[in-house]
Amino acid sequence: MREIIHISTGQCGNQIGAAFWETICGEHGLDFNGTYHGHDDIQKERLNVYFNEASSGKWVPRSINVDLEPGTIDAVRNSAIGNLFRPDNYIFGQSSAGNVWAKGHYTEGAELVDSVMDVIRREAEGCDSLQGFQITHSLGGGTGSGMGTLLISKIREEFPDRMMATFSVLPSPKTSDTVVEPYNATLSVHQLVEHSDETFCIDNEALYDICQRTLKLNQPSYGDLNNLVSSVMSGVTTSLRYPGQLNSDLRKLAVNLVPFPRLHFFMVGYAPLTAIGSQSFRSLTVPELTQQMFDAKNMMAAADPRNGRYLTVAAFFRGKVSVKEVEDEMHKVQSKNSDYFVEWIPNNVQTAVCSVAPQGLDMAATFIANSTSIQELFKRVGDQFSAMFKRKAFLHWYTSEGMDELEFSEAESNMNDLVSEYQQYQEATVEDDEEVDENGDFGAPQNQDEPITENFE
């Protein structure tokens, strides 16, 4: 079976990870001790992807929980879901990264990374055919960003041909915890561009907006935000956990969504999102879900897709839905909004249907878009980074851990390059194919794609 190993790093990563496991246990008919109580064979058919069956018949998540301080891990261990995980897979230090990326990446994290790699190796050896890893972390703190990216590069060295997916929570000015978030996030993106295969960008600001505007929660807690994230993670991984044709593993998902290797940062959306009091006043239909799914207010990243163009889109519908109706609706969206889709990637909207709906819903839809508007998010972090870096503010926290200023400049220019690459492909047209601007950069995919585009006109 094509197994996936899940790694939670840092406080945010562990809390999102715990919410994710709670959600998928419910969907697969497992209780929090790992005992199967399901009533439908489809729930059990691909359980092996995320769970390992122990000799007692208990299903154990292929999950590793890592942090540089014991607090969050203790909270997970003592929660309702704590007995589910293998006790040896909790790995924590006694210090803390203190929200400094350099501590997570070069000093404190580097001391712990070997024991994490040992556990990862052991988990990988317990797989028949490992397809890859998924990591949940935040980019604003110290452990999730610094140690998370260190782990990603170590895993890359050791498993170069396996897929690497990350669920990364980006910092946002409205919900800022620490002043150095822009540094941590930029240094992390610098690593993710090189080492990750697919990164699902989640943004605290967008999550707060959804909770307040759409779900009508006045004071959303982190628990509410994590439930939103776990719904999306459950939706994104639907095609990996249930039998189906499209995007049935991480590699196929990447092939369908990533046109150029560096541009692998996705926006995610989810439908239905309704306030608890309004649910009985709405009917869930495929057109309704499709409309809500493409709505900018449902995006979990604070970027507006209307300001850019979609390179590729994948949509997952769950529940008793007609495949034909889904195809028709998606086709309708594309033809009505053709300006928002780049024309040099034909058939760039993929849809998959899974008959198992999320718990408590008749149907739901998850949306993954590779949109050029994600550059807004990187621009925002980049501007904050530049404002601090040109004054060398708080830099001593990083240089005292052995970092060089040069690494900051490299990270800054890598992120600026990423923004301009997204911009370049947003403006590209089919005619640009062979035109080269003064810098010698190609404006769009080159000649080998030309016949394909022509065939579809």
UniProtKB/Swiss-Prot annotation:
Record has tRNA-binding as a keyword: no
Keyword hit for Nucleotide-binding: yes
An annotated GO cellular component: cytoplasm
Family annotation (Pfam families): Tubulin, Tubulin_C
UniProt-annotated location(s): Cytoplasm, Cytoskeleton
Its job: Tubulin is the major constituent of microtubules, a cylinder consisting of laterally associated linear protofilaments composed of alpha- and beta-tubulin heterodimers. Microtubules grow by the addition of GTP-tubulin dimers to the microtubule end, where a stabilizing cap forms. Below the cap, tubulin dimers are in GDP-bound state, owing to GTPase activity of alpha-tubulin.
Name the UniProt record assigns to this protein: Tubulin beta chain
Record gene name: TUB2
